[in-house]
Regions:
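Acidic, low-complexity intrinsically disordered regions
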Residues: 1-118
Length: 118
């Protein structure tokens, strides 16, 4: 598993999916990954609670001060650790109806970024 300090922060990535943010996402601090969930490694997908966490975690660069290490909730199809998501929404001014892109920047390493409004 890569250490957060070893994650390339400016490397261009392979877009694996884009999702529209809902008011429910904002109210509950999560980002649905449903439409492209199969793009994530199977061993990083766990069950519906922390007790059934995945074997491996992924690194998520969300543009904050630290890279988040988390697995994926296979039942709800979102990042299990969500403490960073409120700050992500606030920092980037994300509102319901905005789009968020997920890119794979290295094996088990991803970047989450808002798509700029036109």
């Amino acid at each position: 598993m890569p250490s957060p300090d070893a994650i390339p922060r400016q490397h261009s990535g392979r877009r694996i999916g884009t999702t529209e943010i809902t008011q429910g996402n904002i109210d509950n601090n999560h980002i649905y990954l449903r439409s492209f969930f199969e793009e994530f490694p199977a061993d990083a997908i766990g069950g519906s609670n922390r007790a059934s966490a995945a074997q491996r975690e992924i690194a998520v660069d969300w543009g904050g001060d630290t890279v988040v290490m988390t697995d994926l909730d296979g039942a709800k199809k979102f990042f299990r650790k969500r403490g960073w998501i409120r700050e992500f929404f606030d920092r980037h001014g994300v509102r319901a109806g905005d789009m968020v892109t997920v890119e794979e920047i290295a094996p088990y390493s991803y970047r989450v970024a808002p798509q700029r409004r036109s």
